[in-house]
């Protein structure tokens, strides 16, 4: 059965997550990305495979609620985000690629 994707893969993956925890997961072959909140696991898998040219073993997602922040007009709210932890079958992704300065 063929699946048709309406979203461009580059619209699904927003950016890689840079944190201590995500760096630790890279050694296990797991990469963390911030993704479009409306994207599902199948769309995330398709996007990773087409952007980076690797095979994905599994995708775990988590929704992070926005933090409550104080503004000069009272209390505000940051927007909620969605993250995906992608496990690869083989290969690796050069997320922080480019020449070093």
UniProtKB/Swiss-Prot annotation:
Annotated Gene Ontology cellular components are:
ribonucleoprotein complex; ribosome
Q: Which UniProt keywords apply?
A: Ribonucleoprotein, Ribosomal protein, RNA-binding, rRNA-binding
What is the protein name for this chain?
A: Large ribosomal subunit protein uL23
Q: Does the keyword Coiled coil apply?
A: no
Q: What does this protein do?
A: One of the early assembly proteins it binds 23S rRNA. One of the proteins that surrounds the polypeptide exit tunnel on the outside of the ribosome. Forms the main docking site for trigger factor binding to the ribosome.
Any one GO MF term held by the record is: structural constituent of ribosome
Q: Which GO terms describe its biological process?
A: translation
InterPro entries noted in UniProt: Nucleotide-bd_a/b_plait_sf, Ribosomal_uL23-like, Ribosomal_uL23/eL15/eS24_sf
Q: Which family does it belong to?
A: Belongs to the universal ribosomal protein uL23 family.
Quaternary structure, from the entry: Part of the 50S ribosomal subunit. Contacts protein L29, and trigger factor when it is bound to the ribosome.
């Amino acid at each position: 059965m063929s699946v048709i994707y309406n979203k461009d893969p580059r619209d699904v993956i927003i950016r890689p997550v840079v944190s201590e925890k995500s760096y630790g997961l890279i050694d296990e072959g797991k990469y963390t990305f911030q993704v479009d909140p409306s994207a599902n696991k199948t769309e995330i898998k398709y996007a990773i495979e087409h952007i980076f040219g690797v095979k994905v073993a599994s995708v775990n997602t988590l929704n992070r609620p926005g933090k409550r922040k104080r503004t000069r007009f009272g209390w505000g709210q940051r927007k909620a985000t969605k993250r995906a932890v992608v496990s690869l079958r083989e290969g690796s992704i050069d997320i922080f690629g480019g020449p070093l300065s």
